[in-house]
Swiss-Prot record:
Localisation: Cytoplasm
Functional summary from the UniProt entry: One of several proteins that assist in the late maturation steps of the functional core of the 30S ribosomal subunit. Associates with free 30S ribosomal subunits (but not with 30S subunits that are part of 70S ribosomes or polysomes). Required for efficient processing of 16S rRNA. May interact with the 5'-terminal helix region of 16S rRNA.
Family label: Belongs to the RbfA family.
Protein name per UniProt: Ribosome-binding factor A
UniProt-listed InterPro entries: KH_dom-like_a/b, RbfA, RbfA_dom_sf, Ribosome-bd_factorA_CS
The gene coding this protein: rbfA
Organism this protein belongs to: Haemophilus influenzae (strain ATCC 51907 / DSM 11121 / KW20 / Rd)
Keyword NAD: no
Assigned keywords, A-Z: Cytoplasm, Ribosome biogenesis
GO cellular component: cytosol
Length: 128
């Protein structure tokens, strides 16, 4: 019987949970603010982890840039805390990446909503 998840997938889920807790409770850098870990991708040998994050202030480019700099500066500390929290032989090297999928999804949703409204207006005007 085949496994449902690869080990790297299970480790990625656990890393996502642990880093979310670490960012919320341990990291005190004011540049980071309200950050959400949206996804984690771990290499098959578990030596590298890409951590995709979003910020509460997604509309402010400067704040996002500062938040990413804060995360990069705190990454060695976060990695050490991750090593203490998880029982892994090798703690993956972590890299933070800003996840634009949420922003893009909202933009696409707004575009679709606007097109539907315009289409409804046309149909109302044509029926009058």
């Amino acid at each position: 019987m085949a496994r449902e998840f690869k080990r790297s997938d299970r480790v990625a889920q656990e890393i996502q949970k642990e880093i979310a807790v670490i960012l919320q409770r341990e990291v005190k850098d004011p540049r980071i603010g309200m950050v959400t870990v949206s996804d984690v991708e771990v290499s098959s040998d578990l030596s590298y982890a890409k951590i995709f994050v979003t910020f509460l202030f997604d509309h402010d480019e400067m704040a996002i840039e500062q938040g990413m700099k804060g995360l990069e500066k705190a990454s060695p500390y976060i990695r050490s805390l991750l090593g203490k929290a998880m029982r892994l032989r090798i703690v993956p090297e972590i890299r933070f990446i800003y996840d634009q999928s949420l922003v893009e999804g909202m933009r696409m949703s707004n575009l679709v909503t606007n097109v539907v409204r315009e289409d409804e207006k046309k149909h109302v005007e044509e029926s009058n």
